Amino acid sequence: NISFVFVNPEKDMQRLLQKGLTPSRLTVKKKGVVSESVIVPWATIQYQNKIENISLLKESSQTTSQEEQLLNSIQNLEFSFIDGLKKIVFPKKKSIAVLTGNGELDDLQLYSFLKDLGRHYHLGKFTLDSVSTAPQKTLNQLDNYDLALVAKPSIAFSEQEKFVLDQYLLQGGKTLWLLDHVVAEMDSMSQKGSSLAFSRNLNLDDFFFRYGIRVNHNMVKDLYAAKISLATGNTGNRTNYENFLWYYHPLVTPSNRHPVSINLGSIKLQFPSAIDTLANAIQKTILLESSSLTKVVETPNFIELKAVNELPDPKIFRQGKKTLGILLEGNFTSAYKDRVPPFEFSDKRETGLPSKMILISD
């Protein structure tokens, strides 16, 4: 049996805050009069000894109006409740290997992402360091995981490491790649006012090419972009800040072509690279795509913060939609087929079992 309890938040706001059910402000316009109301858009599911809080108000981008946010939240209600029920009713069954050793993001940088994943899956750190001395053992250990997460590596992969990941994929393991193919960081730009954006060599171009995609070493600028906050002067001893559109940070609306990306709000990407698709037997589904108002910037190239003051010329933002996130599905052909592999496996494959790969170029 399912029991429903509706609570007036005004009667016990302090207790709700202690549970993490934070209120939101809603602007209401009635008969020309604008007022502000405080709402607590949350639901709590309790099952056996477990409790799951469900946010009913979807997060929005800077360019999303309140009306659009509310409409998106209403459309997302069914998904929110189903997701909450799955978290609390079904036990964790699958596991994710969080790869380290190639300069990936550290735990602090991945904290929010991994915290959310940890509600659904078992997580474990995994390094490919031992692949040069014990490749078969490394692959066997990696095969214990259902998915390998590679988050922003900055050190090139060796052929031995690539071969292990290749065979892992062909044996049915799934992979999620979050790749920065261009070195361009806002921190150094904020200090100096400019920065040299240059290509990052991860030794993966041939790897992905054999699977049917090419991640370019460029940056996609988009007129549909997020804003960055910059200091514009001082008032007394107080620094003034102002928000500026920053076309190197596209605001991407995920496609509804696959359940992975359906009903997601706008996603901010930073200095993403365009992904090209190549003809082969692998099924490809675009998950993240820019608007049609884009300009591709090749690398190496200087990026200057003063560009925020320049009005964009629509005539040069005409390079069309660019793929920034993609899902590959099917029976992959080994990236080492018809090549001499760095070592031999007892169960080496050239054609794989059905598997999946997601690549996001940020």
Task: Report residues per predicted region.
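Acidic, S/T/G-rich, low-cysteine, solvent-exposed domains in lumenal/extracellular/periplasmic regions
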Residues: 79, 90, 106-362
